[in-house]
């Protein structure tokens, strides 16, 4: 198998209504063991490509075929699991062959005691079973399951799938898929619903994975550290590049340096981020160059043809005074679990606080308390007199699938009043990369990334001076992520951002709020990498390993 391609596509095309070629004439061959990052704007056909490779979407032009006999594993954005199974039952489906081999091996050993047994036949079967077990490290199976469950912070083994959140189900599906160890992994946004430490673990796992990995992801550190190839989908074409994210952008810089069409807004965007790039430690020089190259791309005339605007607009709220948010001795529990235990911190003016920690640790609960939707068990939250919160409701879930994008944001109004500003509603919606006919798309037809942008457009209408953003980076393409970073940095107010995107947190965060075990929350001045370095020095490398969260129990 090492000398052959594991998967081949020949002149593959895909037409979607109304007669739009989302993919056209793609011919690619995939090497065994290759790690491929798939990039492209939202709606470019990335998920469609993976569905074709997984054999789910067969209505295509051309030919797509895996090498005979290889095992392909696919993680869709919304995986299907048996709702009646427990977490352990769902995970053990991945290792069913090994479990059956272990059970049968015990039976074979017992059969050797029978004097009439066919010992040659038993020995042959024993050899086959031991080969299966050895190939999957089967004698260490329980440890494997526990390590994977800890790394991806799975819910309790006995929890029923039907009671899990969408994010928890997705983590269970990812864990099951990784334990199956297929020859080829097809991963659609695998880092969504993972916290930053679990993303770092997944990055290391896939870096060392022996099989082929094809991953759609917006995680730029992941693309830099794991990908050996970048496959860019641009207006239907698949353009492969051998190298990681940084080298891909370097080669684009050489071509795009000759482009003349540059727009002042994009030039300003480059300058803003280059200020950060130049302040980076020497160890990040390659990434710094990569960022420069990406912004050169955004300025090219070619780019403007495919994406008319690449700015996000955060309307300035009222002027923010010196006192922003002060939290003193905050405690909050649910049932017998303490989520937050004696938390105190003060947010200075212009701060951008990145909030990290395991799912279910209480990050969103803090937002609900800050906005007054829930009360703490004890302690105080004091907002400055000038503070106006733009708080996160679940707009992604609450949006009306039958409305158009423009209607969902504008409610039919031609002019929107946001804080002290008035802006034409179509121009405002256009600031979120919904152009022309895209504003007439039904909400129910949007991709995950498009829903994310629409969610931002609705949230930012609030016009506050302290933004509370709950996982705003989910499903966004890297271009929109860059625009969001710049918009937050240029906003004159404060922001608190729950995120697992390490590059995003490095770029924007002035402080980190980290949810640990037993309700302990750490407030640190610095960005994500600064915090990780401090944590490693203070508590040792083991402190950076993800594990199932431990809750402090309330004594009855």
Model-derived features with residue positions:
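ABC ATP-binding cassette signature C-motif
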Residues: 1-264, 308, 314-556
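Intracellular alpha-helical coupling/juxtamembrane segments of multi-pass membrane proteins
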Residues: 251-284, 288-294, 298-305
